[in-house]
Design a protein with these regions (language model features):
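Membrane-water interface at the C-terminal end of transmembrane alpha helices
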Residues: 13, 111-128
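Core segments of alpha-helical transmembrane spans in multipass integral membrane proteins
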Residues: 19-24, 42-65, 77-84
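Non-cytosolic membrane-interface motifs at loop->transmembrane helix junctions
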Residues: 34-45, 73-74, 98-108
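Residues within membrane-spanning alpha-helices of integral membrane proteins
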Residues: 8-18, 51-54, 75, 79-82, ...
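Juxtamembrane helix-break-helix junctions at the cytosolic face
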Residues: 59-72, 93-94
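Membrane-embedded alpha-helical segments of multi-pass transporters/permeases
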Residues: 26, 62, 90, 114-120
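Membrane-helix boundary elements
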Residues: 4-45
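Membrane-helix boundary connector in multi-pass membrane proteins
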Residues: 66, 87-104, 121
Length: 128
């Protein structure tokens, strides 16, 4: 498929991004909360489980990057992850407030969401 290179690159970047954040929140959650001056939750599992989910989604993005046309049916699940995170962060950001540590990731996820949507539409056309 033409123009598939940017889609592969996008999902390789998404893999690295989500897997890196997942590992960071599993192994270095205390350091991250301290760095951003945010009180950590009362148990590390509240942060480690979402970190593990980020690694799982990262692996899915890696699969999409390797075989975009064949794996395009997975993209909506990645989009839903981005919608879920953005919806929660932006809702709190614009209503009652949220610590600044969460905001850059919401902006990045919004960009990923839009690009995933464009990639999905292109890949669906290629499969048709």
């Amino acid at each position: 498929m033409k123009n598939q290179a940017w889609i592969k690159a996008l999902f390789y970047i998404a893999f690295v991004y989500d897997a890196f954040l997942g590992v960071a929140f599993i192994l270095f959650h205390d350091n991250l909360f301290a760095m951003f001056e945010v009180a950590p939750p009362n148990h590390p599992g509240y942060v480690q489980f979402p970190g593990a989910l980020l690694i799982v989604f990262g692996m899915m993005y890696l699969q999409i990057a390797r075989e975009p046309v064949r794996s395009c049916n997975l993209i909506p699940y990645g989009m839903l992850l981005k919608v879920a995170y953005c919806a929660i962060v932006f809702a709190y950001w614009f209503s009652s407030g949220i610590p600044g540590m969460w905001k850059p990731w919401a902006i990045a996820d919004l960009v990923f969401l839009v690009l995933f949507g464009v990639a999905f539409m292109q890949l669906r056309k290629a499969r048709a």
